Amino acid sequence: TFAYQVVVDFARARNRIFTGGMAIDLALKSKGSFLYDKYNIDFDFLSPDFHRDAFDLTDLLGQDLEKDRLNAIVAMHPSTMRVRYNFQAIADITYTPHELFDLIPTIEANGCRIVHPCYQMIDQHLALSMPYANEPLINLGGRYKKDFIRQLKLMRAFPPAKYVKE
């Protein structure tokens, strides 16, 4: 879809780091597997300049989408901006200071810079080991199953022991 390509091109041009479900999907596709079987326009990426990125992405999308249906808002966490169209999330852009942003291990998949799958597994492990961390904001059963499936797929495609530095 249009929004999908705009977000991908925007993040590529600014060398932003995809994380979350889209990063997992891109990593798995590089190994012949997948998480999503269709376009998923719910992107998550990291940025040292998240406010500017959110408003710039909103302006860019507004060139072809109805501007009165687009907005950039503060998401659930104050360090994340959400770009929405018709009240549906298109992108969550999370602040990461330059000093940390440059240290995050990444790989390239389909021309996108994504969090290294083994690093992403840390987030998955955290979600699985602390299922009540965001309670009551989440559906525990659905979220837990989703994270468990993601963790298994990542571990099969990217066995952690293969990527240990000595």
Regions found by a protein language model. Give the residues of each.
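Hydrophobic alpha-helical interaction segments
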Residues: 1, 124-166
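Phosphate-handling catalytic interfaces
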Residues: 101-137, 141
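Non-catalytic helical "accessory" subdomain of NTase-fold nucleotidyltransferases
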Residues: 7, 13-17, 88-89, 96, ...
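Short, conserved charged micro-motifs
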Residues: 51-58
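Short, low-complexity, polar/charged sequence segments that are solvent-exposed and flexible
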Residues: 15, 35-39, 64-67, 110-113
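Conserved catalytic core of two-metal-ion nucleotidyltransferases
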Residues: 59-102
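Active-site nucleotide-donor binding segment shared across nucleotidyl transfer reactions
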Residues: 2-51
